[in-house]
């Protein structure tokens, strides 16, 4: 099998993008895992597959696969790369695009400076919508993990997210606690786990352990989740700059019942062929 692909990155979150708008495309879980391997494959955090629209209300559909082959419903950094790919490959001349994923519809717009803005949808805090096992709705929950109690906020923005407020981000804790929480029994579908350090009401630092992938240099949807959780409990303002190891994103959220908007860069790294 020969697969033409484009390698892209958004804030260091890297992707393999495949155009399946004209020819149907399918990989098995084992093939995705092989392609994701950074020593024996191409290497990526997520695989993005662009497909024709499922209905007339959107311009394209795109599928998102983690490095372990699991399909997920949201990827903010990937959405920005999709917008740049569609423009570069002349798949559409629209200034604004609507694209569907497994469970969301996103609105994409390339800004004059080349950055891409994505309307990520309305944050959902009800435990049953995340899903998260809890007796009621709260700003923060106390979760038992091994021999400690962890305070976290939860929200769904296309994917389940757990946000842990910390005074200072500890790299070892991100790897160990993040891995444990990403598959915790309180999250029936797993979760992306963000460690949020509030610098001031307009700036936070964030590191993320993604389910099915591990720690990444950036996670757009978790950046949105962190701002939503921080705004909900009065820690943050409407516009927040989120600094992650791979770069910074600007997140805007006016409040309940309104969508979160994320703005940041997206870059093509190289094009190639994968032979299996």
From Swiss-Prot:
Residues annotated to bind substrate: 13, 46, 66, 76-77, 159, 192, 210-211, 220-221
Protein localization: Cytoplasm
Record bears the keyword RNA-binding: no
Keyword annotations: Amino-acid biosynthesis, Cytoplasm, Isomerase, Lysine biosynthesis
Enzyme Commission code: 5.1.1.7
Catalytic-site annotation from UniProt: 75 (proton donor), 219 (proton acceptor)
Any GO CC annotation of this UniProt entry: cytosol
Entry GO MF terms: diaminopimelate epimerase activity
Pathway of action: Amino-acid biosynthesis; L-lysine biosynthesis via DAP pathway; DL-2,6-diaminopimelate from LL-2,6-diaminopimelate: step 1/1
Gene Ontology annotations of biological process type: lysine biosynthetic process via diaminopimelate
Top EC class for this record: isomerase
Site description Could be important to modulate the pK values of the two catalytic cysteine residues, residues in chain: 161, 210
Catalysis: reaction(s): (2S,6S)-2,6-diaminopimelate = meso-2,6-diaminopimelate
Site positions per UniProt: Important for dimerization: 270
InterPro entries cross-referenced by the UniProt entry: DAP_epimerase_AS (IPR018510), DAP_epimerase_DapF (IPR001653)
Subunit structure, as described in the record: Homodimer.
Family: Belongs to the diaminopimelate epimerase family.
Function: Catalyzes the stereoinversion of LL-2,6-diaminopimelate (L,L-DAP) to meso-diaminopimelate (meso-DAP), a precursor of L-lysine and an essential component of the bacterial peptidoglycan.
HAMAP family tied to this protein: DAP_epimerase
Identification of the protein by name: Diaminopimelate epimerase
Lineage: Bacteria, Pseudomonadati, Pseudomonadota, Gammaproteobacteria, Legionellales
Gene for this chain: dapF
């Amino acid at each position: 099998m020969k697969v033409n692909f484009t390698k892209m990155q958004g804030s260091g979150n890297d992707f393999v993008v495949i155009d399946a708008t004209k020819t149907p495309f399918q990989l098995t879980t084992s093939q995705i895992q092989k392609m994701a391997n950074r020593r024996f494959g191409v290497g990526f955090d997520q695989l993005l597959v662009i497909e024709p629209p499922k209905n007339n209300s959107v311009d394209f559909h795109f599928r998102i696969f983690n490095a372990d082959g699991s399909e997920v419903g949201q990827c903010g950094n990937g959405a920005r790369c999709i917008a740049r790919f569609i423009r570069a490959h002349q798949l559409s001349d629209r200034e604004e695009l609507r694209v569907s994923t497994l469970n969301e519809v996103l609105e994409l717009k390339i800004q004059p400076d080349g950055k891409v803005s994505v309307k990520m949808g309305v944050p959902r805090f009800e435990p049953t919508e995340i899903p998260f096992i809890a007796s009621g709705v709260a700003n923060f929950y106390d979760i038992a993990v091994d021999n400690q109690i962890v305070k976290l906020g939860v929200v769904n923005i296309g994917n389940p997210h757990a946000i842990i407020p910390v005074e200072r981000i500890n790299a070892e804790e991100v790897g160990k606690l993040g891995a444990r929480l990403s598959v915790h029994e309180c999250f029936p579908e797993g979760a992306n786990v963000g460690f949020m350090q509030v610098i001031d009401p307009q700036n936070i630092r964030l590191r993320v352990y993604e389910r099915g992938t591990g720690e990444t240099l950036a996670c757009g949807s978790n950046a949105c989740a962190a701002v939503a959780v921080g705004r909900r409990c009065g820690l943050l303002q409407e516009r927040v700059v989120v600094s992650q190891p791979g770069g910074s994103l600007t997140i805007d959220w006016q409040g309940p019942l309104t969508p979160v908007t994320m703005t940041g860069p997206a870059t093509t790294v190289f094009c190639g062929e994968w032979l299996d």
